Structures are given as structure tokens and as C-alpha cells.
């Protein structure tokens, strides 16, 4: 860790789209876990009205990070549940705590909105610090069991299988 940088976290605004696209592209380029279309996924979710929450990190007037939360469904019908991701920080600003600030701010916001919990597919060693735990009983069939995680934000238990929006799997969904 190079030291914690203080950034302003705010809601995505009209006009941020191009900078978010670039940050996301740059953040995932060449990463072994990247699908390669994270930036296009964000645009699909936005176009489909599935960005429940999009926060950006500003270093002065430069957009240096972004996090997305989208609605997910649980087969037991309980709601609302959210999926976290992608979360992106420009390569030159990584390892400075910006991703952590985005994640904590986003979790606080969806919790304030009444979220029952949040799921994601990601590195357990990274996300456990935010209270995420592996959720093998709830994993969607499309997701790897060893990376699917859940953080409860209420007393409600997750009974059933989660599903991300089809935009996560089909680049032609519009």
C-alpha cells in the first residue's frame, strides 16, 4: 500500500460516462480475472436502468475510480438485494485505499436504502475485510463457487439462489 489518498466520493453524474468507461477499461486491462468487457457491461446496465448505485472517486477534478451496485434477485423472492461490481480504480491510483473507500461508501448507501445484503464474485482474500463470506449455497450456476460471496446487511437470511441481471452474461441484451 502506497499510502491512503483522500478522494471525494460522489454519485455518478451525467457527463461522467466517458471517464468511467476509460477508468474501467484501464483498471481491468491485462488482469487475469478480467472478462475484458467490464466497461461495456457498465454501459449495458446504465442503458437498461439497472445501475441501482454508481459512485465515483474524484481526485480534484479527475475521476479516478468507480463502483457499481445493481439489483440481484434471490429465488426466495425476498428483496432488495444488490450485486457489487465492477469496482475500478485507475492503475496509477491503485493500492492507495480508493477502492476500499468506494466499497465502504457504497455498502453504507445501499444499507441506508434498506438492502438485505450484497453479493459479488471476486477474490475472497480481498473482500473478506469488508465482511463478505463465501456463499456456496446461494451461488448462481454461472458463477464460480470459490469466488461468490455474500454480505448480509440485515437480519434476513439468504435462502435460495441469487441471479445477476442477464446483461452480465449476454452482451446483446439491450
Regions found by a protein language model. Name each.
Residues 112-116, 121-145:
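Conserved active-site alpha-helix within GNAT-family acetyltransferase domains
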